UniProtKB/Swiss-Prot annotation:
Annotated family: Belongs to the bacterial ribosomal protein bL19 family.
Function, as annotated: This protein is located at the 30S-50S ribosomal subunit interface and may play a role in the structure and function of the aminoacyl-tRNA binding site.
Listed name of the protein: Large ribosomal subunit protein bL19
Pfam families assigned to the protein according to its UniProt record, in alphabetical order: Ribosomal_L19 (PF01245)
One GO CC term on file: cytosolic large ribosomal subunit
InterPro entries tied to this protein: Ribosomal_bL19 (IPR001857), Ribosomal_bL19_CS (IPR018257), Ribosomal_bL19_sf (IPR038657), Translation_prot_SH3-like_sf (IPR008991)
Keywords for the protein's UniProt record, in alphabetical order: Ribonucleoprotein, Ribosomal protein
Swiss-Prot/TrEMBL GO biological process terms: translation
Origin species: Ruminiclostridium cellulolyticum (strain ATCC 35319 / DSM 5812 / JCM 6584 / H10)
HAMAP family linked to this entry: Ribosomal_bL19
PANTHER family named in the record: LARGE RIBOSOMAL SUBUNIT PROTEIN BL19M, RIBOSOMAL PROTEIN L19
One MF annotation (Gene Ontology) recorded for this entry: structural constituent of ribosome
Length: 116
Protein backbone atom coordinates (compact mmCIF):
# COMPACT_ATOMS: atom_id res chain seq x y z
CA UNK A 1 0.00 0.00 0.00
CA UNK A 2 2.86 2.38 0.72
CA UNK A 3 4.22 1.74 -2.76
CA UNK A 4 0.97 2.95 -4.32
CA UNK A 5 0.89 6.08 -2.16
CA UNK A 6 4.51 6.91 -2.97
CA UNK A 7 3.87 6.60 -6.71
CA UNK A 8 0.70 8.69 -6.36
CA UNK A 9 2.51 11.41 -4.39
CA UNK A 10 5.14 11.73 -7.14
CA UNK A 11 2.45 12.50 -9.72
CA UNK A 12 0.45 15.07 -7.72
CA UNK A 13 0.83 18.61 -9.06
CA UNK A 14 2.17 21.21 -6.66
CA UNK A 15 2.18 24.22 -9.02
CA UNK A 16 -1.55 24.95 -8.64
CA UNK A 17 -3.06 27.25 -5.98
CA UNK A 18 -5.15 25.95 -3.08
CA UNK A 19 -8.80 26.02 -4.15
CA UNK A 20 -11.71 26.57 -1.80
CA UNK A 21 -15.45 26.42 -2.28
CA UNK A 22 -16.86 29.78 -3.38
CA UNK A 23 -13.67 31.01 -5.07
CA UNK A 24 -14.05 32.77 -8.42
CA UNK A 25 -11.34 31.28 -10.65
CA UNK A 26 -10.01 31.20 -14.21
CA UNK A 27 -9.08 27.74 -15.48
CA UNK A 28 -6.75 27.68 -18.49
CA UNK A 29 -7.56 24.34 -20.14
CA UNK A 30 -5.79 22.82 -23.14
CA UNK A 31 -8.26 21.98 -25.92
CA UNK A 32 -7.26 19.74 -28.83
CA UNK A 33 -8.99 20.50 -32.14
CA UNK A 34 -7.78 18.13 -34.84
CA UNK A 35 -4.01 18.57 -34.96
CA UNK A 36 -3.98 21.95 -33.23
CA UNK A 37 -3.92 22.55 -29.52
CA UNK A 38 -5.03 25.79 -27.92
CA UNK A 39 -5.78 27.13 -24.46
CA UNK A 40 -9.36 27.96 -23.53
CA UNK A 41 -10.14 30.02 -20.44
CA UNK A 42 -13.18 28.97 -18.38
CA UNK A 43 -14.00 31.28 -15.51
CA UNK A 44 -16.59 30.79 -12.84
CA UNK A 45 -17.31 29.87 -9.23
CA UNK A 46 -16.03 26.69 -7.59
CA UNK A 47 -19.17 24.92 -6.37
CA UNK A 48 -17.71 21.52 -5.42
CA UNK A 49 -14.45 19.78 -4.55
CA UNK A 50 -14.49 15.98 -4.67
CA UNK A 51 -12.01 13.18 -4.08
CA UNK A 52 -8.45 13.30 -2.88
CA UNK A 53 -5.00 12.58 -4.20
CA UNK A 54 -4.78 11.95 -7.93
CA UNK A 55 -8.55 11.55 -8.25
CA UNK A 56 -9.38 15.02 -6.90
CA UNK A 57 -11.78 17.07 -9.05
CA UNK A 58 -13.44 20.47 -8.83
CA UNK A 59 -16.63 21.75 -10.43
CA UNK A 60 -16.80 25.28 -11.85
CA UNK A 61 -20.10 27.01 -12.66
CA UNK A 62 -20.75 30.08 -14.77
CA UNK A 63 -23.64 31.69 -16.62
CA UNK A 64 -23.13 31.89 -20.39
CA UNK A 65 -25.76 33.72 -22.46
CA UNK A 66 -28.36 33.15 -19.75
CA UNK A 67 -27.66 29.41 -19.47
CA UNK A 68 -25.81 27.83 -16.54
CA UNK A 69 -22.72 25.88 -17.60
CA UNK A 70 -20.78 23.57 -15.29
CA UNK A 71 -17.50 21.84 -16.01
CA UNK A 72 -15.69 19.27 -13.91
CA UNK A 73 -11.90 19.43 -14.04
CA UNK A 74 -9.45 16.90 -12.58
CA UNK A 75 -6.94 18.84 -10.46
CA UNK A 76 -3.93 16.78 -11.54
CA UNK A 77 -4.81 16.61 -15.24
CA UNK A 78 -2.18 17.68 -17.79
CA UNK A 79 -5.09 19.29 -19.70
CA UNK A 80 -5.32 21.96 -16.97
CA UNK A 81 -2.57 24.43 -17.85
CA UNK A 82 -3.01 26.78 -14.91
CA UNK A 83 -5.56 28.10 -12.44
CA UNK A 84 -5.85 31.74 -11.39
CA UNK A 85 -7.84 32.66 -8.28
CA UNK A 86 -9.55 35.97 -9.11
CA UNK A 87 -11.25 36.43 -5.74
CA UNK A 88 -11.95 34.41 -2.62
CA UNK A 89 -15.50 33.72 -1.50
CA UNK A 90 -17.08 33.34 1.93
CA UNK A 91 -19.51 30.41 2.12
CA UNK A 92 -20.82 28.17 4.88
CA UNK A 93 -21.44 25.02 2.84
CA UNK A 94 -19.20 22.31 1.40
CA UNK A 95 -21.19 22.10 -1.85
CA UNK A 96 -22.92 25.04 -3.51
CA UNK A 97 -25.44 23.09 -5.59
CA UNK A 98 -28.19 25.45 -4.40
CA UNK A 99 -26.74 28.11 -6.74
CA UNK A 100 -28.23 26.15 -9.65
CA UNK A 101 -31.70 27.33 -8.63
CA UNK A 102 -30.74 30.96 -8.03
CA UNK A 103 -30.64 33.78 -10.55
CA UNK A 104 -29.01 37.23 -10.50
CA UNK A 105 -28.14 38.79 -7.15
CA UNK A 106 -29.44 35.76 -5.25
CA UNK A 107 -26.57 33.73 -6.73
CA UNK A 108 -23.95 36.22 -5.54
CA UNK A 109 -21.24 35.09 -3.09
CA UNK A 110 -19.66 37.42 -0.54
CA UNK A 111 -16.01 38.25 -1.09
CA UNK A 112 -13.45 37.36 1.56
CA UNK A 113 -11.55 40.50 2.55
CA UNK A 114 -7.93 40.26 3.69
CA UNK A 115 -7.21 41.74 7.10
CA UNK A 116 -4.14 43.96 7.28
Amino acid sequence: MDILKSIENEQIRTDLPKLEIGDFIKVHAKIKEGTRERIQVFEGTVIALKGSGLKETFTVRRISYGVGVERVFPVNSPRVDRIDVVRKGVVRRAKLYYLRDRVGKAAKIKEKLDRK
